[in-house]
């Protein structure tokens, strides 16, 4: 299996991401269950910070060195036509 990367990200309301992957699939990923603990502290309840999401090295990242593995996004995202 080839490595899956994120090619496009669009921030949705309620801490969700609309993602397009390197294999062409589109999925929506709900970040709410991930936003806890020190790694994600800056975005806890903070949509303004969450909206700063950007593509970085094939995945989604935020300022303050926050990112999430593309494999997690792909495996647990819900397919979006």
Question: Which residue ranges define each predicted feature?
Answer:
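Motif-centric detector for short Cys/His coordination patterns
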Residues: 1-81
């Amino acid at each position: 299996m080839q490595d899956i990367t994120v090619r496009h990200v669009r921030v949705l309301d309620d801490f969700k991401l609309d993602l397009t992957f390197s294999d062409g699939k589109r999925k929506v990923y709900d970040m709410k269950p991930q936003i806890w603990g020190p790694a994600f502290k800056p975005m806890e309840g903070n949509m303004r910070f969450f909206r700063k999401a950007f593509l970085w090295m094939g995945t989604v990242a935020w300022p303050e060195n926050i990112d999430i593995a593309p494999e997690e996004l792909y495996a647990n995202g819900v397919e979006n036509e």
